[in-house]
């Protein structure tokens, strides 16, 4: 019998059980939490536990360790992460049982059907920008739903079901899945050469995908574009939709003037349309974060959030997990301490932006970087850029590449990168095989008063947390 489904409540009653394959992924946990809050029965599987899966379990999700065909029995729909292989036993069982299978981005698009979507795309800055937009709209009383790729520290989660009509999400360009979304507002922060393997190693195809992303807006939709990024600026003439620009560039519709860094804060004048001007203190360091804040300000202004409320939201924003997280002072022995910062940056342009933020806020400190490269393909494709930016720091420790499912590529490992950096004559990198070895190696590199920046998108963040909590290990691990 075919049922007539009138609203989302009918959908939940008809198809209540949703299973997530790879539920621990950054893009999956937020969708799972929103669906739990909507009333779905959520289950999921992953090969490893993390804080997000443990949170889902406390909220009522059934989370299984490892993948098994039995995990999908009785499920009405299977949501799959892009990291899951086609021969996964749960996917194979779902196909044999004719259970609907939804890619992660397709399920995100389904959630967007019931709300006005704001999708944030761009090679860098998506998570911070999405979080800032959610903070501005929340401060403005719009109570948005949001799904973010990192933990919004103020909420203690990377997702929340709000009572308002707006849904704020990250739009992932890495595999082209952002083209499944149909937002009302599209933000593009920047466009860079990353994930080229998914675009035939052709940068022009990435740019074409962003153009198509904007063309998916309805005729009454809005494209918010960063004028400071030359690739994004080119989109303004191709969008064929309503466009608003933002940036530090003097021609931007929403812009920042008189930008000054004060330690971990940025101070600037926010210039909005119609002559609205307010002083802003942003509780995040770096010029790149000013641009992220301008995107959020533009969205807030478009949706009627008063300028003073926008300023208040930016000032009170406490950040996102693993985005320039100040973990405090850590002892290195003999009464000496260093300042520890943890950051997710894993692309040369991201490293450059974070290094600039450190030097702008703490110009007198020696910058020591512990970096875990992420993916052999990215290390190969950005090899010279990595060597250039990493050779600029005062001291460097490299761990082996975090593979993220890739097989090693000759000449794209940590030792090869160290040789290229050494050849530039500025620094002598230290290479460790396992990222956990940083705990015992770093004390020999560090000096009193250093700023230690631990960066990478792999598991180096867990090592930073261990150091912050337990300190360094002197002697044997």
Curated annotation (Swiss-Prot):
MF terms in GO: ATP binding; UDP-N-acetylmuramate-L-alanine ligase activity
Subcellular location field: Cytoplasm
One GO CC annotation: cytoplasm
Major localization listed first in the record, in broad terms: cytoplasm
InterPro entries the record matches: Mur-like_cat_sf, Mur_ligase_C, Mur_ligase_C_dom_sf, Mur_ligase_cen, Mur_ligase_N, MurCDEF_pg_biosynth, UDP-N-AcMur_Ala_ligase_MurC
Residues annotated for ATP binding in this entry: 122-128
Listed pathway(s): Cell wall biogenesis; peptidoglycan biosynthesis
EC numbers on record: 6.3.2.8
UniProt xrefs under Pfam families: Mur_ligase (PF01225), Mur_ligase_C (PF02875), Mur_ligase_M (PF08245)
GO terms of biological process kind: cell division; cell wall organization; peptidoglycan biosynthetic process; regulation of cell shape
Keywords: ATP-binding, Cell cycle, Cell division, Cell shape, Cell wall biogenesis/degradation, Cytoplasm, Ligase, Nucleotide-binding, Peptidoglycan synthesis
Domain of life: Bacteria
Catalytic activity: UDP-N-acetyl-alpha-D-muramate + L-alanine + ATP = UDP-N-acetyl-alpha-D-muramoyl-L-alanine + ADP + phosphate + H(+)
Magnesium listed as a keyword: no
UniProt record similarity statement: Belongs to the MurCDEF family.
Function according to Swiss-Prot or TrEMBL: Cell wall formation.
Protein name: UDP-N-acetylmuramate--L-alanine ligase
């Amino acid at each position: 019998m075919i049922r007539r489904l009138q609203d989302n409540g009918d959908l939940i009653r008809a198809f209540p059980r949703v299973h997530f394959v790879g539920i621990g992924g950054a893009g999956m946990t937020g969708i799972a939490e929103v669906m739990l809050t909507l009333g779905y029965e959520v289950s999921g599987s992953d090969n490893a536990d993390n804080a997000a899966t443990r949170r889902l379990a406390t909220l009522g999700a059934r989370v299984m360790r490892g993948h098994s065909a039995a995990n999908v029995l009785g499920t009405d729909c299977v949501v799959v992460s892009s990291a899951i292989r086609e021969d996964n036993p749960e996917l194979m069982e779902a196909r044999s049982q004719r259970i609907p299978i939804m890619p992660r981005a397709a399920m995100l698009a389904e959630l967007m059907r019931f709300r006005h979507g704001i999708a944030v795309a761009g090679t860098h800055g998506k998570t911070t920008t999405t979080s800032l937009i959610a903070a501005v709209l929340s401060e403005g009383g719009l109570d948005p739903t949001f799904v973010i790729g990192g933990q919004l520290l103020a909420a203690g989660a990377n997702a929340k079901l709000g009572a308002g009509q707006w849904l704020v999400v990250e739009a992932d360009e890495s595999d082209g899945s952002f083209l499944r979304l149909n937002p009302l507002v599209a933000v593009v922060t920047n466009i860079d050469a990353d994930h080229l393997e998914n675009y035939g190693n052709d940068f022009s195809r990435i740019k074409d995908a962003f153009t198509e992303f904007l063309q998916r807006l309805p005729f009454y939709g809005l494209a918010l574009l960063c004028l400071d990024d030359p690739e994004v600026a080119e989109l303004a003439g191709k969008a064929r939709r309503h466009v608003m620009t933002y940036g530090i560039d003097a021609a931007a519709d929403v812009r920042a003037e008189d930008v000054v860094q004060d330690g971990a804060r940025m101070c600037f004048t926010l210039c909005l349309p119609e002559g609205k001007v307010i002083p802003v203190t942003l509780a995040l360091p770096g010029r790149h974060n000013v641009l992220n804040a301008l995107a959020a300000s533009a969205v807030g202004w478009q949706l009627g959030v008063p300028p003073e409320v926008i300023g208040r939201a930016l000032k009170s924003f406490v950040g996102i997990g693993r985005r320039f997280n100040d973990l405090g002072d850590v002892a290195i022995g003999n009464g000496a301490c260093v300042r520890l910062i943890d950051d997710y940056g894993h692309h040369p342009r991201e490293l450059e932006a974070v290094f600039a933020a450190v030097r702008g806020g703490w110009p007198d400190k020696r910058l020591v970087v512990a970096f875990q490269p992420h993916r052999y393909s990215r290390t190969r494709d950005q090899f010279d850029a990595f060597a250039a930016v990493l050779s600029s720091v005062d001291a460097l420790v490299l761990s082996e590449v975090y593979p993220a499912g890739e097989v090693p590529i000759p000449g794209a490992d940590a030792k090869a990168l160290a040789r290229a950096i050494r050849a530039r004559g500025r620094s002598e990198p230290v290479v460790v095989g396992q990222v956990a070895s940083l705990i015992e190696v770093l004390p020999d590199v560090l000096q009193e008063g250093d700023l230690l920046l631990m960066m990478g998108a792999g598991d180096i963040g867990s090592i930073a947390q261990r150091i912050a909590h337990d300190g360094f290990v002197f002697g044997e691990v």
